[in-house]
Structures are given as C-alpha cells and as structure tokens.
C-alpha cells in the first residue's frame, strides 16, 4: 500500500454521510424524472454509514459485536471481511459508498447504474411489481424501481449476506430490504436517501443518505480490479475519476436516417452456447499457441485463460456470451450489459475512433445503422483475451466488425468478422443469435467471489498475466479458511 494512496484514503474516510456543501461545478437541477440520469461523482466516500441523525446504525447485540470486531480489524490494516479487497462484488449499499464515478442510464422500463468499479452494474426493472420472494441471494439483489414525481424509488431485496454495507464492515443478513429515494436537489446534486430494514441485524428500520455531484470531466472507466492488485495497487482506488479523466470521445456526427432504427432494447440471451470457435484460419504463430495449450490440457493441466482469470475482453462476449444481455439504446449510444462474462460495452453511434487509443479489454466501439442492421466496428484491444476455451489467441491488432440484424422470429442474428493478422491468416466470420429473455433481471456473475487454492494447484496459464492475485487458503484443524492476496509471483 503506497503512502499516497493511504493519504488519499484518510481524506476520503469520512465518518459522516450526506455532506451539505455545494460541490464545485454543480449545475442547476434538470426537470422531470430523467434529471437523475448521467454521470455522478460522490461528494464523499464514507468509511462508516451513519443514520440521517448522524448516529450509529441501531444494531442488535450480535451484529454490534461483529461490527466492533471488524472496525478493530480495519484499524489494524486488515480488511479481509470486505469482499472488495479481493475484487469480489461490493453489494448494496456498499457500491454507492465507493470513491468512484457511476452513470445512470435509462431506456424505457430498463434502467441501469453503471459503476466505475470493476465493471459492476445494477439493472433496475421499472416495469413490474416488487420482488418479494427472490429465488436466491445475489450481490446486487433484485432491484425494482418506480417514479414518484421526480423521485426515483428503488426497492432491492435478495442481497447476499456475504457483502458488507460500508468499508468498516457494517453487516447485514439476506433479509435486508433496501429502499432508495433518488432525487436531484435544487443545487444540482443527487441525493440518495436509503431506508434500511433488516430484522436479523438491526433493532428497527433506519435511514442514511449519500450525495453526489456532476463533473463534466468525469468518465466511468473500464476498471479491471485484478490488474490493479497484480500491480500492487489497492482494490478500491481513491477518487481519480476527476483528476485523471480520459479525454472526451470524438463528437458524435449526426447522420440522417431514412427510417427509424430498429429497437434492440430489452433483456436477451444466447439461443445456443458453445465454448469453441471452429474453422479459424490460424497462422503458424496462432497454431503454435493452440497446440501448446492442447498439450497442457492433455497432460491433465487446467487451462487458465483471460475468462477464467476474471479478465474477459469484449471479444469473449462476441464469441462466448452466456446468460443474459441487457441492451439500452439511445440515438448516441447503445450500451450492452453482459451477465457472463460481466462487462459493459458502449457503442458510440455515428462517431469515429480517436486518432490515438489506449489499448484495453473492451476496445473502442463505434456503430452505425445500415438499413435495419446495426454495424459495430471495434479496435483498440490490448490482446489479453482468447476467442474460446481452447485459448485461440488475440493480439492488439485485433479488429472486429459485428452486424446485428433483427430476425422475423423476434431474435437477433449476429455476424462477427474477426481480423487479426498476427494469429490468423485471413479474416473470418462467426455467427451467433440472441433471443428475448423472459427474465426481469440478469443474474450477476461474480468471477472473483471465491477463488480457492485448489483451483490453481494444477493450473496452466496461457499468459503470465492470468496468474491469480488472491485465493482462499483452507486452514487446518479449527482454523478457518481465509483470503490471501499478493503479487502473482508470490
């Protein structure tokens, strides 16, 4: 842990929520329900949640004892009670207390919070009744929203008790019901007033409040937590979204359309799923990698790819998407939220690629409509992704062109043309298809939830980057298992 990071955390570790001073750059409040949409930056990143009366939460005796022990751990520099320290999901309301920007987007009855920490998002159903009997507990639960005038009310149930509510480790049970009331204040800030109900943890319901402000320079990054841990950086970064904001993307160039674009909005799922991409015209270099991977697996080794190491690139969502995909569509951006692998892809419509790009896992995607087909061109990959479970490689030269065409049966037919001269002799095309899902919510995929030591004892790493940073080590006798993090070489 660096001294600079520690100092930043001390500045952020405010123990009182809901600061009331006006944030720099605050804008006048917009009107209507959609005033809550956009990118927001926390006014403070509270280490400890307090009630709106600035008092400690009304914990019962057992929960108070546990919370006190966790605060002592925090003071001693041990945060192993917090899953975010090994890049597992933050849960709620922990995600809203983190010192990173987030964006609220809406398309019809589909609303999403896109968080700036490790690709987490919340998909909120605005069109149905409350969920009262969740099928299983999830990291982000099952949020259902509604509008009360200009206030967005979100009720979330089904939150797993494996997460904590604040950085000090405030506990909760899986009976937690969290009701948020989000509204834009007259000074332009966003207020999130939360009612907490959990009879197994608290003696009564209580309220807390967080506030956020807009910042024209803020961006929601494509954050990859394991990469930061591997570099010796903290899992929870200090507020850097303003100081180190990326330059804005190129201005969108309006292109007149002869007919309205098809609507892709909704929740989708693959018609079929396969772990293999067949018939790829591998170059000599590509074939050598595939043969080396095959030999390792034939020898009984377990292959660790980018997907398995929780670093899946956008190309993985093109070739091997699993489970649900949420699509939010607007004239200037189409946003794809993938359940597995968990990822947010942004397609900037009628735009151009920047002249210079910092390579990343998701690349830079620009789209256009050709009649009823959405054409997406993506470059700027970092080369740390595989096409399939055999480890067919990609390089930074990877260039993909996707064509999404609505079919007569209501599904979406997809063609993906892949060009990568380092590993493939010529461009080739694969076909996929998505169908409408009956689900109201995606189930999140928390890849880093429980990496166990035995999972890596006979591992073969396609790339050194994929070595684990954190793993759960089983204790002996009465010693409980614990999560241990360190640099991959350790």
Language model region names:
Residues 7-18:
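Bacterial N-terminal signal peptides
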Residues 1-4:
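Positively charged n-region of N-terminal signal peptides that target proteins for export
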Residues 24-490:
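PEST-like low-complexity, intrinsically disordered acidic/proline/serine-rich tracts
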